[in-house]
Amino acid sequence: MSGTVNTFSARAGGMLLALACLAGSAAAATGPAGYALDNTEVRDIRARALQRDYQLYVALPDSYRDGARRYPVLFVADANYAFPVVRNIAQRLHKHAGMEEVIVVGLSYAKGDNGMHSRRRDYTPSVPRKQAYSAVMPGRPPEFGQAAAYGKFLTSEVLPLVARHYRADMRRKVFVGHSYGSLLGLEMLLSEPRSFEHYILGSPSLWFDAGVMFEREKAYAGRHRDLPASVFFGIGGLERLAPGKKRSRSEEDADMVEDLREFDGALRTHRYPHLKTQLRVFHEEDHASVFPSVLTHGLRSYLSSSK
């Protein structure tokens, strides 16, 4: 009997060892679980006119499940990197500075696209006339100039979806962009300014296409007597032209700080009755580091706070 038990135990031990090895192999293959942000979800959305697929990354406030109130909603370009930054800063400003809570909606790049390829195409207002660009996706030429079409996708499909599925206060919509993302914001500001009630635009690439947005601003002023919008511009103080270089409207020789001052000044000269702009230069920041500061001050310029 004891031999039988010993034989069984040996077999059972062998089976357990085999199972342990298999479990170890599976764990090694899958790796540790990824980190998830609380109260977030992802929605797929088809841009029908563009024939492309995107995702919306949605962060809900901590109090969302507790009542029936509606919340201001932030729409964030370049969400693949900006969404967690915006979500966490907005949450921290609420918890520690008394800022009202918000819903955050991140706008992803197109599915299957390299991020740079997607943002070049969807966020820029025109095809560059004087500068050639290399492809960033194998087998696909560079694409530019579809900001107007992408903006229509936002207003006709994304905004209605958010209004249907979430308790968003659609009278308090905020667009958040940086760099090319700010070009998209300017495209919408100068075509359908009421798409959003507030624009937070960091380090806009006003050098793009030899300063085409300056032309768009001038054309808008020639056709309109008002620009109903609230805009917060922010930029890093280090986003200036290097000493000894001659300023031009090209990526290599742009003085982005002076470009933004000039653009904001042009808007102000028209004295639009319902336009409110602010411009802030963050002196120790550059193009890569300035976004969190722009976001923080841009939110504070629009949202209410109890402290």
Residue ranges and their predicted role:
Residues 13-24:
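Bacterial N-terminal signal peptides
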Residues 26-72:
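A domain-start/cap signature at the N-terminus of enzymes
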Residues 207-276, 281:
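The feature captures the conserved acid-bearing segment of alpha/beta-hydrolase catalytic domains
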Residues 187-197:
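Conserved hydrolase catalytic core segment
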Residues 100, 195-205, 230:
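A conserved short beta-strand
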Residues 177-181, 185:
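Gly/Ala-rich beta-loop-alpha elbow adjacent to hydrolase catalytic centers
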Residues 167-178, 199:
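Alpha/beta-hydrolase fold nucleophile elbow
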Residues 69-153, 157, 161, 165:
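Serine-hydrolase catalytic machinery in alpha/beta-hydrolase-like enzymes
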